[in-house]
Amino acid sequence: MLEKNKYLYIFRHIQTNQVLLSQGNVLKKTALFQLPYPLQKPVAPNGMRPAKLRKDHWVPLLKVEFPNESMFQSVFMQLLNYRKYRSVQPLTSDLLKLPIPVRRRKIMRQEVPNTIADLADILNKEKFPENSVRLQLSDKSDSEYADWPPSVQIDSEEIKLSRGFREKTTVDEAR
């Protein structure tokens, strides 16, 4: 039986460091609704949610391969729940002292480390077999944001930055 989807793709915005999760190797415009914004308006203030998905502004952050689709779905939903939980938490007193534009930028800058740490936390809680989850990063220093469980095997090859993820076979065949 062919697995429908067992890959999780995570993209980051090159200017704001916001993070989007995807089930495919390219982003769909509906992915923007993952970005936290409390009001139900199509355009968020001061760029908290871009009005349109510009694919040249989003670069691959990491790719995770799971043993099967059910594990992938579980981790994907938990990551979305972590993000939702984080967006409704009250701000710390240090953040409240900052002017609103500075506060928003600081919160957005923390999305990459928070997402990576959340992923590691979920993988620590789930009991996957050893080396069953493969992780490929665009920057090896990003792996330092978390303590990875033994079930995670970090790929030595970095992701090539482009407007989407490119599979190794596709790049090799093009040469």
UniProtKB/Swiss-Prot annotation:
Superkingdom to which the source organism belongs: Eukaryota
MF term (GO), any: DNA strand exchange activity
Cited InterPro entries: Ribosomal_mL67
Keywords for this protein: Mitochondrion, Ribonucleoprotein, Ribosomal protein, Transcription, Transcription regulation
Localization annotation: Mitochondrion
Subunit structure of this chain's protein: Component of the mitochondrial large ribosomal subunit (mt-LSU). Mature yeast 74S mitochondrial ribosomes consist of a small (37S) and a large (54S) subunit. The 37S small subunit contains a 15S ribosomal RNA (15S mt-rRNA) and at least 32 different proteins. The 54S large subunit contains a 21S rRNA (21S mt-rRNA) and at least 45 different proteins.
Name under which the protein is recorded: Large ribosomal subunit protein mL67
UniProt source species: Schizosaccharomyces pombe (strain 972 / ATCC 24843)
Organism lineage: Eukaryota, Fungi, Dikarya, Ascomycota, Taphrinomycotina
